[in-house]
């Protein structure tokens, strides 16, 4: 039906007869001559319809609407000098139409314009409801092609490194791995349920036991959790596992993988090696295990300086086992007024959103004099002032913002404020479209964190991470005592403040695996019922193994310069886990429920029947 793509025509095609197919992007009537911008996935080209050269084509062109599907025959010619368009790849040429065939018309009004000239003005709800139309837009088309290029680049690298792609089951059993499972009732096995996999974690470990040695998969995963801009109920991860490799070898190989992807997709040579930081240092210096290292404003712990001062908010926090930390905002004196920092202000509100009661502040003036409001200034000795200035490195014009309270809340609040101010003050661009790629390995995570509400330990990553041998007693009878404080041989790759992927070395000893499951509160009988197959596999000569999984949706979001993974997925869900286009999820017939041996207990809170 066509000889060329619309966006492929160049000066070397001049005088060629071509056939093009595509959609009408725009139509312009210039007093007897009609111009059509014809668009397909390759781009857009200008069609000139002159009644003297094609009366029938002109008659068709007079009544065309945007998004009408056309086949156009004509001759490529150079555009006259005054009509050259350097914003288009095809801007040096146009096609003189000799024939136009309408392949399909648009019936009724379009829900929104598709043309690149109008695409930024459409509400996301409309875009998702009519996703098939939204996908015609250049931005979405480019994103999906970039996604395909990313996956292809990963496959090429991994296959060159001896990995093989293996599919793992989508229907499996529910296990306590972390997030809530999506579960499906079994019709054949009444009263029993499948679960959709949150990750292929156990299956890829079993593949290592099976001697596969190097596995990868572009895996679909499912988690029934609260959503946000970079989460979906169903998502894709590049899943990798390998045997007979230590942590250093795994990190190096995955650095090479990332570098090959960035080179193939962006044409960028990333600097290596990627920096590394321990989890403890990340939390102390940035308040998060996903630090954005493109800018400064690191957190400074000043608890020891203010622990005895008369300002009870500070001294009380330290005495109760918490912390006082601050961030130094360069140029903050001029950029941030008191109104913005005090209650009701935007900066104050960011701290509150993270659970903090608020912020305290000090302004560093010329001559390194400090200025504050009320009790802070009045209760700081000259020695404490100098210690604060020395430790924070604050210069004149710097604003010091303080958080005080339990350490976790202080970290969370100052991390949020830090990220907010970096965008507000232009330290990073407000969107992800930038040329800064600050990769960072975060290593030495704790194995566990204590859940005070449930009075038990929880695995920080998952209960299959191997502990650091330095932190584990060689006497197995001591494991119950030494495991809670152990570091995991786990690692996350962070890019510009977002977790790009994470993994660990795995436990390959069944006795240690049982002890870890007991540490997270799983009784031996339940552990055997849930994970007996894994324990049996570890007992038949499981090799040392480890791996990593990258979030494909998030990786493509960063590569594409988007703010939401929804713009990198063909048919995403909303933050309410709904597909607005198909109206999923939806109800099912009573007969289907009967066949599945399931009854619904749902009561509509509105009081209306479904």
Curated annotation (Swiss-Prot):
The record marks 30 as: Important for tRNA non-discrimination. Pfam families: GAD, tRNA-synt_2, tRNA_anti-codon. L-aspartate binds at residues 177, 223, 461, 506. Its main location: cytoplasm. GO terms for cellular component: cytoplasm. Its EC number is 6.1.1.23. This is Aspartate--tRNA(Asp/Asn) ligase. The gene is aspS.
């Amino acid at each position: 039906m066509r000889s060329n793509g619309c966006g492929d025509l160049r000066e070397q095609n001049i005088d060629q007869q071509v056939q093009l197919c595509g959609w009408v992007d725009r139509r312009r009537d210039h007093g007897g001559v009609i111009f059509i911008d014809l668009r397909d996935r390759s781009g857009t080209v200008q069609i000139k319809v002159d009644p003297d050269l094609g009366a029938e084509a002109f008659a068709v062109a007079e009544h065309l609407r945007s998004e009408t599907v056309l086949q156009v025959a004509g001759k490529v010619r150079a555009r006259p000098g005054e009509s050259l368009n350097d914003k288009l790849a095809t801007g040096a040429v146009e096609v003189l139409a000799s024939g136009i065939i309408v392949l399909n018309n648009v019936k009724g009004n379009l829900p929104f314009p598709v043309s690149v000239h109008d695409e930024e003005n459409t509400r996301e709800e409309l875009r998702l409801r009519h996703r098939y139309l939204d996908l015609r837009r250049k931005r979405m088309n480019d994103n999906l092609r970039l996604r395909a290029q990313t996956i292809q680049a990963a496959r090429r690298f991994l296959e060159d490194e001896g990995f093989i792609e293996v599919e793992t089951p989508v229907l499996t059993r529910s296990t306590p791995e972390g997030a809530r499972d999506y579960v499906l009732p079994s019709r054949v096995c009444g009263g029993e349920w499948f679960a959709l996999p949150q990750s292929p974690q156990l299956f890829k470990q079993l593949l290592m036991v099976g001697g596969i040695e190097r596995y990868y998969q572009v895996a679909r995963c499912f988690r029934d959790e609260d959503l946000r801009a970079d989460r979906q109920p169903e998502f894709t991860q590049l899943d990798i596992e390998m045997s007979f490799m230590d942590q250093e070898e795994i990190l190096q190989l995955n650095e090479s993988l990332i570098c090959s992807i960035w080179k193939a997709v962006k044409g960028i040579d990333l600097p290596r090696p990627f920096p590394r930081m321990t989890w403890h240092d990340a939390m102390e210096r940035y308040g998060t295990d996903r630090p954005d290292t493109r800018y400064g404003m690191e957190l400074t712990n000043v608890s020891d300086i203010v622990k005895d001062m008369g300002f009870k908010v500070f001294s009380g926090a330290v005495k109760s086992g918490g912390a006082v930390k601050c961030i130094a905002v360069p140029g903050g004196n001029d950029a941030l007024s008191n109104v913005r920092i005090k209650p009701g202000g935007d900066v104050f509100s960011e701290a509150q959103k993270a659970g903090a009661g608020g912020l305290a502040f000090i302004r560093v003036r010329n001559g390194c004099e400090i200025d504050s409001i009320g009790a802070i200034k009045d209760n700081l000795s000259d020695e404490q002032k100098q210690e604060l200035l020395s430790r924070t490195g604050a210069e004149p014009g710097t604003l010091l913002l303080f958080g005080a309270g339990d350490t976790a809340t202080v970290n969370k609040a100052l991390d949020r404020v830090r990220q907010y101010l970096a965008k507000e003050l232009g330290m990073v661009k407000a969107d992800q479209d930038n040329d800064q790629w600050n990769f960072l390995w975060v290593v030495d995570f704790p194995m566990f964190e204590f859940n005070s509400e449930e009075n038990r330990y929880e695995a920080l990553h998952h209960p299959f991470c191997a502990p650091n041998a330095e932190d584990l007693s060689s006497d197995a009878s001591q494991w119950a005592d030494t495991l809670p404080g152990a570091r995991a041989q786990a690692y996350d790759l962070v890019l510009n403040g977002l977790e790009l992927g994470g993994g660990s070395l795995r436990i390959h000893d069944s006795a240690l695996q049982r002890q870890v499951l007991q540490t997270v509160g799983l009784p031996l009988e339940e552990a055997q019922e849930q994970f007996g197959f894994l324990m049996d596999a570890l007992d038949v000569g499981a090799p040392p193994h480890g791996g990593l999984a990258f979030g494909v949706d998030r990786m493509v979001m960063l590569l594409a310069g988007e703010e939401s993974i929804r713009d990198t997925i063909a048919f995403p869900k909303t933050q309410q886990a709904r597909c607005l286009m198909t109206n999923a999820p939806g109800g099912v017939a009573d007969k289907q429920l009967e066949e599945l041996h399931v009854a619904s207990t749902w009561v509509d809170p509105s009081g209306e029947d479904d």
